């Protein structure tokens, strides 16, 4: 049986792989390289358009739990991430080019996957899994809006990507390698700012000119990828309690904690490119260079890529989708990825995994897995399909949407690890039914 998967991002790539591994013939349709969105830079599958970090690796983090669930269940995205990992303290960060190439090669070489390039403007007949992501083309978005009732089913807001600089252009006499609280290895470049330097930077950042917006009707901002200039305008100290917080960092040149610290994280395996952590932005390119050069260690920084802002499109999933990411009104159509309202790289891959596994089981005449809310995979699918939610917003995985333990555990870290252990025990029991 053939299944059409539309979109070869994280969710679509994961879904196509899982279906193909289960013996289904998959037609993977991807608009790149024929048409490339403003946020994409290559024709590779599973391109990371924002940060190169898949966030926390430990089981005290909900996203760390989600990664471990996927890893144990045979996720191609986690396999690729582990194979292309770069040092990032307690986080799982990857060489973005190596990661995308790994996934692209795996899919193109799979005997059950046929790749068709070109824009899709309407859904084909038969079983379809739609994973066109936050950058769904206008034509397909219009088609989906009509398909889902002709209402405001798709909402628009902005995501933003941080600039990249060459390591050799960073003034390391004004910066140092360390991780916060010396946790893990010293993987971050830390750029200290004294009070006067920070305040001058903050004032210019607040006043800096943003790039012109074309073709968008609103500017709703999701907190997880908020532009640094928007955050700065919320108050003089907002950045110092956010991405520029100095806590846990001591400047070796002064022996004390700086007033503010800008952190840079390795963006490729070679360590030749670093990204400005938390500096997603929609400023004009010239303004980025002018304002960010006020950070002492970046006064002569060479920008490999300036920050950009792009649209995000997602469905009113509680009204439209069930816990298997299927369209309630037309179950032959399944959705996955950020357009369902899951937010983040790992969450997108997780939705693609669950959607594909449950789709395969339905087509095979098997009972659904029904991942429970005690697991991260189940919690996400139950969140996006919760009909009691009225003002639906995109959501990262977090322990708040996973079922509580039902008993007290002293300490937040211990409690979270206990929740993770419970989840992984459930995953191990489900594993024989799922893993191919």
What do the PLM-derived regions correspond to, one by one?
Residues 69-143:
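Feature captures the FAD/FMN-dependent oxidoreductase FAD-binding
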Residues 395-436:
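C-terminal auxiliary extensions adjacent to catalytic cores
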Residues 1-11:
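Beta1/beta-strand and adjacent pyrophosphate-binding region of the FAD-binding site
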């Amino acid at each position: 049986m053939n299944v059409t998967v539309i979109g070869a991002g994280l969710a679509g790539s994961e879904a196509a792989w899982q279906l193909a591994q289960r013996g289904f013939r998959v037609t993977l349709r991807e608009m790149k390289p024929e048409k490339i969105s403003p946020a994409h830079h290559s024709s590779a599958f599973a391109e990371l358009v924002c940060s190169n970090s898949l966030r926390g690796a430990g089981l005290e983090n909900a996203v760390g739990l989600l990664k471990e669930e996927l890893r144990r269940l045979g996720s191609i995205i986690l396999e690729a991430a582990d194979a292309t990992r770069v040092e990032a303290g307690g986080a799982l960060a990857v060489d973005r080019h190596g990661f995308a190439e790994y996934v692209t090669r795996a899919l193109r070489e799979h005997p059950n996957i046929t790749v068709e390039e070109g824009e899709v403007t309407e859904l084909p007949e038969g079983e379809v899994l739609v994973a066109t992501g936050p950058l769904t083309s206008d034509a397909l978005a219009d088609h989906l809006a009509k398909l889902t009732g002709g209402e405001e089913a798709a909402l628009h807001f902005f995501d933003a990507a941080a600039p990249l600089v060459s390591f050799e252009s960073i003034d390391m006499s004004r910066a140092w390698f360390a991780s916060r609280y010396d946790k893990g290895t010293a993987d971050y470049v830390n750029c200290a700012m004294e009070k006067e330097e920070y305040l001058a930077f903050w004032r210019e950042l607040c006043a800096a000119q943003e790039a012109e917006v074309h073709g968008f009707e609103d500017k709703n901002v999701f907190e997880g990828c908020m532009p640094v200039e928007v955050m700065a305008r919320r108050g003089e100290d907002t950045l110092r309690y956010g991405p520029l917080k100095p806590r846990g960092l001591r400047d070796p040149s002064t022996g004390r904690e700086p007033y503010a610290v800008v952190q840079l994280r390795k963006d490729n395996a070679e360590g030749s490119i670093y990204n400005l952590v938390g500096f997603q932005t929609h400023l004009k390119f010239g303004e980025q260079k002018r304002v960010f050069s006020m950070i002492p260690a970046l006064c002569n920084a060479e920008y490999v890529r300036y920050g950009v802002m792009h649209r995000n499109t997602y469905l009113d999933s509680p009204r439209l989708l069930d816990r298997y990411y299927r369209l309630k009104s037309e179950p032959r159509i399944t959705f996955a990825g950020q357009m369902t309202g899951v937010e983040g790289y790992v969450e997108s891959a997780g939705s693609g995994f669950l959607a594909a596994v449950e789709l395969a089981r339905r087509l095979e005449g098997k009972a659904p897995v029904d991942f429970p809310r005690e697991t991260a995979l189940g919690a996400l699918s139950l969140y996006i399909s919760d009909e009691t939610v009225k003002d639906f917003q995109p959501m990262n995985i977090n322990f708040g949407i996973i079922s509580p333990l039902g008993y007290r555990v002293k300490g937040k870290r211990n409690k979270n690890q206990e929740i993770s252990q419970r989840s992984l025990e459930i995953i191990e029991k489900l594993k024989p039914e799922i893993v191919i």
